[in-house]
């Protein structure tokens, strides 16, 4: 979303997103890689016998850890090997997802009638924005570093709480103007 904020007025100029693109998509890239690695273990466990929830949990842990580390050891219960995934390897596995994240940025910018140079501040929203590749893509697109002082998973809740406060008359001095 692109907002104009001034003197207590929050005006939404444009909003765009891909509801079919989320953290689960990134997780499945690691799961697919992991299945290939497990299948390559000599005398290993059959991949079909590993519950999907176990693989997804391992993938999610790896994804989160790769946001702050260059490599992560992935351990799957009942598999006698540890699999190491590198951040650059994960980014290559999910390069198309990163490209897909760019399209809503371009659309919102176009809908708002703005160029990236006209954006003063970039606030990231959602857990996937913790990934360095996503942050780098946004920085390259907007020409400035995203704010790092706001938790990307809490920012939506804070906005919703502010809007609820305004609607309930519990918050004054703030005007929210949605996109028309």
Task: Name each region found by the language model.
Residues 1-180:
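Oxyanion-binding/catalytic loops of NTP- or PPi-dependent enzymes
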């Amino acid at each position: 979303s692109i907002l104009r904020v001034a003197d207590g007025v929050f005006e939404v100029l444009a909003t765009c997103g891909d509801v079919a693109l989320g953290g689960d998509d990134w997780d499945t890239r690691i799961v697919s890689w992991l299945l290939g690695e497990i299948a390559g273990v000599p005398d290993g466990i059959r991949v079909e016998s590993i519950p999907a929830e176990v693989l997804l949990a391992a993938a999610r842990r790896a994804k989160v850890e790769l946001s702050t580390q260059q490599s992560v050891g992935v351990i799957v219960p009942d598999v006698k090997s540890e699999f190491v995934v590198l951040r650059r390897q994960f980014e290559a596995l999910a390069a198309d997802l990163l490209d897909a994240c760019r399209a809503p940025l371009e659309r919102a910018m176009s809908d708002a009638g703005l160029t990236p140079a006209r954006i003063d501040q970039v606030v990231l929203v959602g857990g996937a924005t913790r990934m360095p590749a996503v942050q780098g893509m946004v920085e390259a697109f907007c020409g400035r570093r995203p704010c790092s002082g706001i938790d990307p998973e809490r920012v939506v809740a804070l906005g919703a709480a502010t809007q609820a406060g305004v609607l309930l008359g519990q918050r004054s001095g703030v005007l929210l103007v949605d996109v028309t």
